[in-house]
């Protein structure tokens, strides 16, 4: 493989695996526990998907942000395996990229152990050489630190890399790291929301990546 794009970095939640119901139910339980007098609809919760937990909880309830983070993680882990789903075609596309010797990595705002749990449940763990979680960086996306760390570990350059995600934090992180970027049309907030951040590509299905990287050769 001698193409321009050699390295593909992925967000996890909402990109590779469908954790939307898990995330929404976990937020609902956390908010009910700490803010029982306030009503949060699913639509209210959608903006919380993407930023780090502390960023979200400090904005909602700064006095109890750390307690909310702990409660969220405990609830999330308890219900994790029952509520995550695979997106159609993701496994096959990632396997094809792996078999064609592309360098594959994860850059997520989740903790490393939780990322690995999701990857193992869906059987994707064997395809990724590098996994960067929130506990491995000082600055979460959209800061480019995680992407730059992944590229260094993969011995890759920004010029040959693309960042793929379902949230503006992913697209902005890629732009800040000066890689190519791709949004996914199956993002819970919708492709129109993601398009306003001007990713270089918009994937209708994960297999679209195969055409993109082959076209760059």
From Swiss-Prot:
GO terms of biological process kind: DNA repair
GO MF terms held by the record: inorganic diphosphate phosphatase activity; magnesium ion binding; phosphoglycolate phosphatase activity
Catalyzed chemical reaction(s): diphosphate + H2O = 2 phosphate + H(+)
Gene3D superfamilies: HAD superfamily/HAD-like (3.40.50.1000), Putative phosphatase, domain 2 (1.10.150.240)
CDD domains: HAD_PPase
Keyword annotations of the record: Hydrolase, Magnesium
InterPro entries to which the protein is assigned, alphabetical: HAD-like_hydrolase_sf, HAD-like_sf, HAD-SF_hydro_IA, HAD_2, HAD_sf, PGP-like_dom2, Pyrophosphatase_Ppax
Cofactor dependence: Mg(2+)
NCBIfam families for the chain: HAD-SF-IA-v1, PRK13288.1
UniProt family annotation: Belongs to the HAD-like hydrolase superfamily. PpaX family.
Protein name: Pyrophosphatase PpaX
Species per Swiss-Prot/TrEMBL record: Listeria innocua serovar 6a (strain ATCC BAA-680 / CLIP 11262)
Name of the gene: ppaX
